[in-house]
Amino acid sequence: MFNEITKSVTWNGKVLELSTGKIARQADGAVTVKMGNSVLLCAAVVANKAKEGIGFFPLTINYREMAYAAGKIPGGFFKREGKASDREVLVSRLIDRPIRPLFHPAFVNETHVTCTVLSYDPETPVDILAIIGASAALSLSPAPYLEIVAASKVGLIDGEFVLNPTLELLKTSQLDLVVAGTADSVMMVESEANLLSEEQMLEAVKFGFESFQPIIKIIKELAKEAKKPKFQMQDLYPASLKKEIEKLFVKEIKQAFAIKSKQERSTNLDLIHEKVLTHFVSDIENKKYSNYQIESALKSIESDILRNEILEKNRRIDGRSTTDIRQIACEIGLLPSAHGSALFTRGETQSLVSTTFGTSLDEQLVDSLDGEYKERFMLDYIFPPYSVNEAMPMKAPSRREVGHGKLAWRAINPILPNKVQFPYAIRVVAETTESNGSSSMATVCSSSLALMYAGVPIKAPVAGIAMGLVKEGKKFAVLSDILGDEDYFGDMDFKVAGTSEGITALQMDIKISGVDFKIMKAALEQARLGRLHILDQMNKIISKPNSKLGKNVPSTTTIKIDKDKIRDVIGPGGKVIKEICETSDAKIDISDDGTVSVYASDRDKLKVALDKIKAIAVEPEIGEIFNGTVMKVLDSGAFINYLGTKDGFVHISEIAEERIETVGSVLKQGDIVKVKLIGFDNKGKAKLTIKNADKDKSSNNPKQKNNVNNSKENSEPERRDSSKKRAWNEDNNSDTTEVITERKYFN
């Protein structure tokens, strides 16, 4: 019944198996990929006819992670997989980028590739298997897929490169890099790095490139045995058509490309396109040429003009040399109500960023095959149509926006402080208000500026730059800070972000074969120099984080309590914690390990909530000093309430240094006094003293005398040594910690 063909290879100690002919047999190409306990089905379908009137290749990649693959039922109200998650979108783009340039340029048939995770093994990189499976499925299909792609993941642990590291290993890795390519060339690189050098990044790419060569071999073997006949393709347009257009219109096209303004240049080129189509209207009606052929020939002429100017004259369409970077302008703090804001402008590309701080309750909950986790740092990239002067409606985030946002996220994430150093959730919203090339790298720059202005103690400023390439034969030119047209007509889009010390993110897409490591090395070095120049310009505005947070940033404190006390703080049905939140107007988040995070709009509200939590969860130490309230006066002494829920007794002999006749002559019900815990009686009740409590060095206000006052202040716990930033139970070897974020991070 089945004519199954299987090819396998041992890869990094595991067997990778590709098979076809058993599942999804009606698809033009279908491959099942197995490695460890991971199983993926990759199916490719190609329309029989070209799509009329379309000016691009309609390739769609869909990567899907089914919950059952990890033995789970989808969370939420609907127990079925819905729209693609950000992770699925990002992997779909990861598959698309190395594959798209390898189709015949004249091929415009609708093509769909679906990669479905059927079984998930966290020990194997399913995103890498999806790229391999998609490439194999297309190689079996009739689509004119000209070369075969494979991919690998590279980590860097203890100075050694690791092939296809597990999720657990990636937690300690200095690098998370995906590289894809053919037998001859690297086609795509995507990475996040912890301040690695250009040399380390290049070696990682080489390591990954060499590692996937055996995979290309077995895909070729599978395709040779099982593939279907390929579509026979003709040239994109007749050579005579291009010559005729050049003869009639090349002078006008060159004049248009001499215009430095993007909008003016685009308007002039659009008019020329209309003029050319009008000239060939009879040929279009007679079906001698199609609109697509004419447009393609025009684009080829435009490409020749742009590329020749660069290679022959070292001159770009805006007048710059290959290494020049456009003029830069930076501004910070322009949005008064935002916690942090910045505007970064580089030529005709501009990014406006706002930074907002939230509580741990505001962190993004992510449901994945590996389980649920929270993202503390969120970066949303927005590309409104007006940024390129297009009249279009605003829609849900596109795949491009998700991808660009994640690239900027990777660039910023390595330099952020950890949660102990900075306990806030951080959301960065980056709106591209103008775009003419490299808007994602402008987002990196503006995000770095906004975070520093907001007071986030980042390790170092970060900048990003997009590099391009024009290559003809052995002659090539690497372009710094590319324009949109240079990206479109060029051979490479190479984005590099990092600090002055090293790279934090790298993304490379190559459109041609033959880009060797010599070219990549030159591009990385040129990018380093460009990045340093941009950082110099940014540092003129702000070079390190502000020492204080803004006035409208919520105050926060984090303490740790015993796990056994969590239930007491929460109370039955959440009654206690709700009461604390309502009376203090604060937000409280309690982790399973006993970490309690308290957030409030000001310090007073924060203190009220914190006092109530400590009153419930913290056992006082002997020697601790508190503000207490006199609850009842007796002949022998007085009962004092402290920490809100705790009571102790002060004997008459412990009220004053001198002898007093009656307790009532000194204390009255409702008085606020300082008391020190001196011990417990045989029934466990607290014994307190008022004598010398105000003279103890631990008093928060040692100059204040312990006079009776009738103010209605909230009882406030105090510590024996206020100079020590310790928590309540440190003397008992507790791991309690308290972090107050209204402080200076830099001296």
From Swiss-Prot:
Compartment list: Cytoplasm
GO molecular function, one term: magnesium ion binding
Region of interest (Disordered), residue spans: 691-747
Annotated ranges, domain KH: 554-613
Enzyme Commission (EC) number: 2.7.7.8
Residues given in the record as Mg(2+) binding sites: D487, D493
Catalytic reaction annotation: RNA(n+1) + phosphate = RNA(n) + a ribonucleoside 5'-diphosphate
Residue ranges of domain S1 motif in the record: 623-691
Function summary: Involved in mRNA degradation. Catalyzes the phosphorolysis of single-stranded polyribonucleotides processively in the 3'- to 5'-direction.
Alphabetical list of PANTHER family matching this protein: POLYRIBONUCLEOTIDE NUCLEOTIDYLTRANSFERASE, POLYRIBONUCLEOTIDE NUCLEOTIDYLTRANSFERASE 1, MITOCHONDRIAL
This protein's name: Polyribonucleotide nucleotidyltransferase
Protein species of origin: Rickettsia akari (strain Hartford)
Gene it is expressed from: pnp
